[in-house]
């Protein structure tokens, strides 16, 4: 799980960690509210420091300015392997510049991959993605959703997360039946 990976990497370096979730919320790609994202991630991994992006600091660049203002001089960001180059370029492009996001000037910025390549279709945490988990919710496949959820989560917590995603997507039983009939 990404959160555990970040916590372990920070501990190894003797550094603080912060998990940032997007502040966006919509039925299609972000069915959980920012508050629900923080609640579920914090409960899933004890000791994690999870925050949602806010109206005051809505983007990654705003968050970098906030960290710089708080006195941090080095930043290491952990992302999926497919996003390393993109974030490396973005963060370095604005380092030392004043812009609408504010200002940051870190001595070092590292962007690292969280583990290896994602294993599509594996069914477990290695193949977990928000897209795949939302598909399981749409199909009413709670068992597959549970397999992709962090192993440290209790069944009750996985059920609560499943319900929250389902509600956020506007999925109800009649929709699931129609969807299953459509794909059959």
Kindly give the residue locations of the regions a language model identified.
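Nucleotidyltransferase catalytic core that binds NTPs
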Residues: 1-183
């Amino acid at each position: 799980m990404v959160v555990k990976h970040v916590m372990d990497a920070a501990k190894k370096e003797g550094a603080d960690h912060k998990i940032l979730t997007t502040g966006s919320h919509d039925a299609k790609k972000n069915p959980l509210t920012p508050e629900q994202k923080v609640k579920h991630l914090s409960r899933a991994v004890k000791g994690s420091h999870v925050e949602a992006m806010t109206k005051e600091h809505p983007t990654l660049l705003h968050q970098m300015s906030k960290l710089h203002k708080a006195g941090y001089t080095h930043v290491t960001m952990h992302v999926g392997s497919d996003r390393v180059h993109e974030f490396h370029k973005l963060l370095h492009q604005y380092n030392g510049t004043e812009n609408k996001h504010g200002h940051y000037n870190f001595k070092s910025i590292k962007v690292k991959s969280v583990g290896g390549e994602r294993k599509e279709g594996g069914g477990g945490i290695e193949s977990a993605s928000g897209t795949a988990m939302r598909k399981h919710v749409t199909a009413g496949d709670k068992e597959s959703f549970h397999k992709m959820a962090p192993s440290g989560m209790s069944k009750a917590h996985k059920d609560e997360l499943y319900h929250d995603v389902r509600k956020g997507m506007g999925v109800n039983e009649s929709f699931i039946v129609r969807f299953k009939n459509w794909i059959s």
